Amino acid sequence: MVVRREKKSRKMRGSRTMGWGIRGQHRDRGSQGGRQIGMHKEKWSWLVKYGKGWYGKHGFRNPTTKLTSAISLRKLNELLESGYIKIKEMDGKKIVDLNELGYNKLLGGGSISIPVTIKVGKATNKAIQKVKEMGGEVILSPTE
């Protein structure tokens, strides 16, 4: 391809269309924007098909809400049996510290098959009862 030494715009002055052929070819829609620009104009058809809920108000996240990271006895039992959670031995007791693992509440769903001492911030009455029936205990130690 031949290198253009002078600008096309400079060479074609006075030629009515300046290299764009028929007059209407250069009268197109201009810049349609980049990423996520013009959703209410140029990209409306895409928005109608894929962008449900693009416009409007959609609530907010309450900054004072405290999120709880809970684990059920069923899930805890699975993690203990698979070896994913290591049991610590201290004074002949098997101890699992859920606060260290990022959980702050123990739920009573399911059952546990290993008698362990569980340290956690909060626990339901049902969970405490089931752990005691198995021969373990629940120590409530708030993290906050």
UniProtKB/Swiss-Prot annotation:
GO terms (BP aspect): translation
Q: Which UniProt keywords apply?
A: Ribonucleoprotein, Ribosomal protein, RNA-binding, rRNA-binding
What is this protein's gene name?
rpl15
Using the record for this protein, list the coiled-coil segments as residue ranges, or answer none: none
Which intervals carry biased composition (Basic residues)? 1-14
What is the protein name for this chain? Large ribosomal subunit protein uL15
Q: State the organism named in the record.
A: Saccharolobus solfataricus (strain ATCC 35092 / DSM 1617 / JCM 11322 / P2)
Described function: Binds to the 23S rRNA.
Which molecular function term from Gene Ontology is one that the record holds?
A: rRNA binding
